[in-house]
Amino acid sequence: MYALVDCNSFFCSVEKVFHPGLEGKPVVVLSSNDGCIVALTPEAKAIGLHRGDPIFKVRDIVEGYRVAVFSTNMYLYAAMSKRVTNILRTSIQHVENYSIDESFCDLDGYEAHFDLVEMMREVAAKIKLWTDIPVSVGIAPSKTLAKMGSKFAKKYKGYQGVCMIDTDEKRRKALLLFDLSDVWGIGRQTLEKLNYYGIHTPLDFADKSESWVKSHLTKPGVQTWLELNGKPCIDTSEVMRKKTICTSRSFGEMVGNLDSLKSAVANFASSCANKLRGDDSGAKKVTVFLSSNRFREDLEQYGNAASQSLVTPTSDTMEITQAALRVLAKIYREGIQYKKAGVIVSDIEPLHPFQPDLFDPIQNRPERAKLMQALDAINHRYGLKTLRLAVEGEEKQAWKVKCEHRSPNYLTDINGLMVVGDSF
């Protein structure tokens, strides 16, 4: 059996931990650049707000109902996510952090000694007590069914936070009630194909013969079908393995000069390299893209992208940044006011075991790897970007995103530590 532990309205829940006076009140978290709503509490949904709403279009509702508005703070959310995962590991041996707000738990063997529902309720209560983050839990023989169970646990209070799908009767009832478009692994194209063949519920899909599924769908579709029938076959570590990593931003202000673009692209490249090291992976291709503001018809429009291949997979910040800046120089055009840029690293491979290349222009890779370790250690201890490349520039720059409502980094920055007696 598997359990899927899903943090409820995670971004908003984290903000409420540090602003307890917001309990029971509408709260929303905005996307980068404070553009649109990416997370909201049930109270915010009740007054007519929706995920994806541009904030300027719902300003009257936000102000009229005194909605608490926060800018996204991924450093704070990631730190709290790590705490939730660590708490899970105090009770369950095999825990896989699938996303920032979801973790899979392998419960194999626990059913012989515990009532799984009561056990997971105790785990959920511990998470709530230690972090104040509410969670919903789904338990089932496959990960897809466990994700489905967590949705039911979140939607229906009668489950008291934990929904277990452990019999064929429960499985079929869940498949009948669940929305096919919400099934993990069923994207838009697959949904359209299934609908074309008269399949409108997960139960319709699960009841199809194996031969039909194999003849009409690709391997992921077959895996989803097996999972819906209670047969676990999805290796989430494979699903999670990134094929590309992208860091991009819409600028807070339009940028025209090359130096500012270099600073932005260097920051994005550095972020990609940091993510690669976190996955113990390296990339062999670096892509940079630029675009003007398509909503400003009075300005000249331009967009372009180009790539550079590397000799060997790397996660070295300096190497990736240098490659990105070379690409930027090729696609930059003077006289354009740029609104967005980004860096993509691809052709990602595990860094270990490392295979040296005879023609590698960097001959001191072991020493460079130690330098990157030192860079990461300093930034982990003293705060992100404490140590950075000179080309990345100062912390405050015009191109950086708007984040007028961002909370301090209470858990990762000594300057953001909350003082006892602070008013909320």
What are these regions (language model features)?
Residues 182, 190-337, 353, 424:
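DNA-contacting surface of Y-family translesion DNA polymerases
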Residues 98-102, 140-143, 281-285, 336-340:
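Short Gly/Ser/Thr- and Asp/Glu-enriched loop/turn motifs at secondary-structure junctions
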Residues 139-143, 290-292, 342-347, 391-393:
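A general secondary-structure junction signal
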Residues 1-226, 236, 365-424:
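Gly/Gly-Pro- and Ser/Thr-rich, intrinsically disordered tail segments characteristic of DNA damage-repair
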Residues 10, 33-36, 293-296, 348-352:
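Short, charged/polar surface micro-motifs in flexible loops or helix N-caps
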Residues 319, 325-381:
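C-terminal hydrophobic structural anchor segments
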Residues 103-109, 305-311, 355-360:
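Short, hydrophobic beta-strand segments
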